[in-house]
From Swiss-Prot:
GO biological process: clathrin-dependent endocytosis of virus by host cell; fusion of virus membrane with host endosome membrane; symbiont-mediated suppression of host innate immune response; virion attachment to host cell
Entry keyword annotation includes Membrane: yes
Gene Ontology MF terms: protein dimerization activity
Record's protein name: Genome polyprotein
Keywords: Clathrin-mediated endocytosis of virus by host, Cleavage on pair of basic residues, Disulfide bond, Fusion of virus membrane with host endosomal membrane, Fusion of virus membrane with host membrane, Glycoprotein, Host endoplasmic reticulum, Host membrane, Host-virus interaction, Inhibition of host innate immune response by virus, Membrane, Suppressor of RNA silencing, Transmembrane, Transmembrane helix, Viral attachment to host cell, Viral envelope protein, Viral immunoevasion, Viral penetration into host cytoplasm, Virion, Virus endocytosis by host, Virus entry into host cell, Zinc
Transmembrane portions of the chain: 448-468, 480-496
Pfam family for this entry, one: Flavi_glycop_C
Glycosylation: residue positions: N154
Amino acid sequence: SRCTHLENRDFVTGTQGTTRVTLVLELGGCVTITAEGKPSMDVWLDAIYQESPAKTREYCLHAKLSETKVAARCPTMGPAVLTEERQIGTVCKRDQSDRGWGNHCGLFGKGSIVACVKAACEAKKKATGYVYDANKIVYTVKVEPHTGDYVAANETHKGRKTATFTVSSEKTILTLGEYGDVSLLCRVASGVDLAQTIILELDKTAEHLPTAWQVHRDWFNDLALPWKHDGNPHWNNAERLVEFGAPHAVKMDVYNLGDQTGVLLKALAGVPVAHIEGNKYHLKSGHVTCEVGLEKLKMKGLTYTMCDKSKFAWKRTPTDSGHDTVVMEVTFSGSKPCRIPVRAVAHGSPDVNVAMLITPNPTIENDGGGFIEMQLPPGDNIIYVGELSHQWFQTGSSIGRVFQTTRKGIERLTVIGEHAWDFGSAGGFFSSIGKAVHTVLGGAFNSIFGGVGFLPKLLMGVALAWLGLNTRNPTMSMSFLLAGGLVLAMTLGVGA
């Protein structure tokens, strides 16, 4: 699956009868959804971008100077005049020069002198700013069912589907083929202040340099370089790249300050690099909060017969996925399609299946299958696939796993923020409380009771509540009632 190849992976486990779960998706992360009686899915935020954002300013990094002209007057003859002074696109400077008999003036003294030069910009030497429009930013969410096929990190799963969202998007329904339909309703949020963010892009050259950066608007507007708006042929403040020498009689030299690309690149050291793909300008941070509807999903292969246990062979022996799960792949030489008999037992309990399958109902298909992912309790275990067996030691501890999943649940609830609560009605408020409990404690509950059936969990919750009602000690009574209520809520709830 896609999530097994990413470092930032989260698990959301639906309870019995779950029809809807709430996910927090961020760039670079991936969430695996598991629910009893439903196929597992990987969901991730693939990209945040805007196509062809509006230009704000263009800066010139290297001036192109031409048509230099100088005019001078003798002392007492008035100011020197050039018609170019009144022309747009020229840079001029007035000064005083020493005049006398040696340079054709009858009087000694200071005479007026003016120099003008036409200023343009060298080709491929512009830095352009682009601004984002929050209403036009597209958030791409991808969904991939766990089909039992191994897919390498650089390959694309044939069942992968894509949904796009903006601030005004409605619910999207994706068809996952034989696995049914899944609905997505996502609220989007960028991770940057779009009003104060500019994408600074250099003209593309053959140099192997970053071409775009994500900068602050005030910093961008304060750049001491010639600038113009898109479509305007003339540069404002072109004198910033022009230097005039000291005047000598009727002569004033004009100097080009040269290419400022290196100076700009030095100033951009440490600034986040922006990713541009064609006309898509990507944001580096942001998240979406999605309500995922599972009610129309269906399990594939429930009508298959069980595979012949003696005809399996390891293709990839069990391996740690890096996400507190175990992944493996088998081949099968018998009649296809069929269901893979897979289980795991802990040391000292040979009759209790302790495997929590991330790949539900693993199957061998005519054209693939055989990839299995499972979660095992910490300690010594034996994995069985048909007649194959493999000794496995799962690192960690049950308490540590509970704390880790609870911490992630609190992080999810924090990111969802105000959207997690509905104060419009009493029913909505209590529903919000249920969702919050599932978001924070769902992973921990699954870690503790993952191998316990629905009926035992229900009876346990009822028993704890009954003890709470019949205990005379107030502290013990409240403790039993709270524990029983949580077990019942997590067992019977349909929101996660």
